[in-house]
């Protein structure tokens, strides 16, 4: 049976060789250094994440170890281990005595199980013992001010059993097997105070219109206001990739979001092709939104031209756009009479759920007879309400609303609403209308225009 440590080294070197063949770096030494630094960073990040979870659970992930013995093979063996948890095989009563574990092995006759090395998951848990000394403060292994056992010269022969100081040895512990993604913390209130400016690229009118159309239905940019969308489009950079070029690599950190202008891109997960995308499609959004590795490898199936948006610009524009939209809508909603019964918290949730739509003079916002799916609040501009039976009914302006009747009673639109000039409306879908408006729905029912002589006011 091969040595586990040797097998681990062999696997790592094999993986490194595959990476070198795949990416063909010019500077092999630097590539190898970056490769192992990235692996080390990921391992340490996971280790300290587990430590934080353990502390939150009241568990000492780094129990103190006074001495280690060295066996005849030169392997350090921990004596007097002080585990931070008790045997899972004992009585279920959490207050019972767990000191005796009938399944525990004699460490004197099974020293190999207690060997420490080759990673945090290869140490003996010694679950039969419970901690007798209080845990001491954790030590950062990277702190140069702290002594390390690795820096002590080996002054004893391999056959001697001597005691040497040892740094704290982490207990293998998985506080929570479920993993999650996260994003860097950015404080939107401080964004206005720094000097950061988004990049601006000189695009032709045709290019701007094409990119705006491509972004129109993208779920990340759909909620941005007009100014934020213009900022995104102006910041896009054109990148060209030859056929068979790896655009993004599965497992790498996300750096760019891409929109395909021309060509075809194939996507692979674990070397298996899963899909393809072509002109007008986009990819790479999630790795920019969240601090998580790329979920797939993207390879240019043909010569490809893409528009790319870098991570910092992506995060800043989205965050600022969302933050500014919330502030604007919260102020706007406070002035609408029918919404004054909402609490500040409910108003904030409603502000986050609203979407902005723009219409030009003559555009029909809703049409008589159509099925209603949205509720509308007029932010600016003027609208005319009319139907075939009564003709012009009334005009609506800033702060007015329409479309509620079709959602409350699940009826077709009772009238057409047309923009008299440039109009900006905030829209709320049917599910959000029922979920977020709460007591306001009852008020709207009381104001049901079908109860009056004007059956079209609710549209």
UniProtKB/Swiss-Prot annotation:
Binding site for 3',5'-cyclic AMP 2: 338-454
Residues at which 3',5'-cyclic AMP 1 binds: 220-335
UniProt keyword Repeat present: yes
GO cellular component: cAMP-dependent protein kinase complex; chromatin; cytosol; nucleus; plasma membrane
SUPFAM superfamilies for this protein: cAMP-binding domain-like, Dimerization-anchoring domain of cAMP-dependent PK regulatory subunit
Region of interest called Disordered, as start-end residue ranges on this chain: 78-109, 125-168
BP-aspect Gene Ontology terms: adenylate cyclase-activating G protein-coupled receptor signaling pathway; cellular response to glucose starvation; cellular response to heat; cellular response to nitrogen starvation; cellular response to starvation; filamentous growth; negative regulation of filamentous growth; negative regulation of Ras protein signal transduction
Coiled coil: none
GO terms assigned for molecular function: cAMP binding; cAMP-dependent protein kinase inhibitor activity; cAMP-dependent protein kinase regulator activity; identical protein binding; protein kinase A catalytic subunit binding
Keyword terms, alphabetized: cAMP, cAMP-binding, Nucleotide-binding, Phosphoprotein, Repeat
Entries under Pfam families matching the protein: cNMP_binding (PF00027), RIIa (PF02197)
UniProt xrefs under InterPro entries: cAMP-dep_PK_reg_su-like, cAMP_dep_PK_reg_su, cAMP_dep_PK_reg_su_I/II_a/b, cNMP-bd_CS, cNMP-bd_dom, cNMP-bd_dom_sf, RmlC-like_jellyroll
Modification Phosphoserine, positions: 180
PANTHER family per UniProt: CAMP-DEPENDENT PROTEIN KINASE REGULATORY CHAIN (PTHR11635), CAMP-DEPENDENT PROTEIN KINASE TYPE I REGULATORY SUBUNIT-RELATED (PTHR11635:SF152)
Protein family: Belongs to the cAMP-dependent kinase regulatory chain family.
The protein's name in its UniProt record: cAMP-dependent protein kinase regulatory subunit
Lineage: Eukaryota, Fungi, Dikarya, Ascomycota, Saccharomycotina
């Amino acid at each position: 049976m091969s040595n586990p440590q040797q097998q681990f080294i062999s696997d790592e070197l094999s993986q490194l060789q595959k990476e070198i063949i795949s990416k063909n770096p010019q500077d092999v030494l630097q590539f190898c250094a970056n490769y192992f630094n990235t692996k080390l960073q990921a391992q340490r990040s996971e280790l300290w994440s587990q430590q934080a979870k353990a502390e939150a659970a009241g568990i000492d992930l780094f129990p103190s170890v006074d001495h280690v013995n060295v066996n005849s093979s030169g392997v350090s063996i921990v004596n007097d281990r002080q585990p931070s948890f008790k045997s899972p095989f004992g009585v279920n009563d959490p207050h019972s005595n767990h000191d005796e574990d009938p399944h525990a092995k004699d460490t004197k006759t099974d020293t190999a199980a207690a060997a420490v090395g080759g990673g945090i998951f290869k140490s003996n848990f010694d679950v039969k013992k419970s901690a007798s000394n209080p845990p001491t403060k954790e030590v950062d292994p990277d702190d140069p001010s702290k002594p390390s056992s690795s820096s002590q010269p080996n002054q004893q022969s391999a056959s001697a059993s001597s005691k040497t100081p040892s740094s704290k040895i982490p207990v293998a512990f998985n506080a929570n097997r479920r993993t999650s993604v996260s994003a860097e913390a950015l404080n939107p209130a401080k964004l206005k105070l720094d000097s950061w400016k988004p990049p601006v690229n000189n695009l032709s009118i045709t290019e701007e219109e094409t990119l705006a159309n491509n972004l129109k239905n993208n779920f990340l940019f759909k909620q941005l206001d007009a100014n934020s969308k213009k900022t995104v489009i102006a910041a896009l950079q054109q990148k060209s990739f030859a056929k068979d070029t790896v655009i993004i690599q599965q497992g790498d950190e996300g750096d760019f979001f891409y929109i395909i202008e021309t060509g075809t891109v194939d996507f692979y997960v674990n070397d298996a092709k899963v899909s393809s995308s072509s002109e007008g499609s986009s990819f790479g959004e999630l790795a920019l939104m969240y601090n998580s590795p790329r979920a797939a490898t993207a390879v240019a199936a043909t010569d490809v031209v893409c528009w790319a948006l870098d991570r910092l610009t992506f995060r800043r524009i989205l965050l600022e756009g969302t933050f500014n939209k919330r502030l604007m809508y919260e102020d706007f909603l406070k002035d609408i009479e029918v919404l004054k019964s909402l609490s500040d918290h409910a108003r904030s949730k409603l502000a986050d759920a609203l979407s902005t739509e723009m219409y030009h003079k003559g555009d029909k916002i809703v049409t008589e007879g159509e099925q209603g799916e949205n509720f509308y609040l007029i932010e600016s501009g003027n609208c005319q309400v009319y139907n075939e039976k009564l003709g012009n009914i009334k005009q609506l302006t800033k702060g007015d609303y329409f479309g509620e009747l079709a959602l409350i009673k699940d009826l077709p639109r009772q009238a057409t609403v047309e923009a008299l000039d440039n109009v900006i409306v905030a829209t709320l879908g049917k599910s959000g209308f029922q979920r977020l408006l709460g007591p306001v729905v009852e008020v709207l029912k009381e104001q049901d225009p079908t109860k009056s002589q004007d059956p079209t006011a609710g549209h």
